[in-house]
């Protein structure tokens, strides 16, 4: 059964049910906010704030929007948008686009243990525009325990091997 929501102006909007293929990913739904830090051999270490929103349309994918800002002065740093799919109950595909001219397809296992959900993904394809920096591989490990989301991101770029780049802890601010 679909839920109905009324917005100002008496516009009725039907909110679809989460697609059955996404049952395992449902704990991601909502908006998450928190802090992280980054490092890489070619840049100075930095701290950032982050907001991530996972949504759905009733189709067999989650929508994903991510934004980061510098912790010291709030200037925009990075953004990503994409889709998360679970073609099988124990496997995830994450399709991402970056405004820096990079696209990623990452795949990997999805495990659930009680209220803990874990994904360990590695890029199977990286697309680059002609002007984008060289990125050869990206890996993400994400864990959701209750209302806490933690992740690490590894990257191979500009001639460097796959290594730690980012880590963050976020908390659910809305479902």
UniProtKB/Swiss-Prot annotation:
The keyword Iron belongs to this UniProt entry's keyword annotation: yes
Highest taxon listed in the record's lineage: Bacteria
CDD domains, A to Z: lipocalin_heme-bd-THAP4-like
Ranges spanned by the short sequence motif GXWXGXG, renumbered to the chain: 30-36
Cofactor: heme b
EC number: 5.99.-.-
Pathway listed: Nitrogen metabolism
Biological role: Heme-binding protein able to scavenge peroxynitrite and to protect free L-tyrosine against peroxynitrite-mediated nitration, by acting as a peroxynitrite isomerase that converts peroxynitrite to nitrate. Therefore, this protein likely plays a role in peroxynitrite sensing and in the detoxification of reactive nitrogen and oxygen species (RNS and ROS, respectively). Is able to bind nitric oxide (NO) in vitro, but may act as a sensor of peroxynitrite levels in vivo.
Name of the featured protein: Peroxynitrite isomerase 1
Organism this protein belongs to: Mycobacterium sp. (strain JLS)
Lineage: Bacteria, Bacillati, Actinomycetota, Actinomycetes, Mycobacteriales
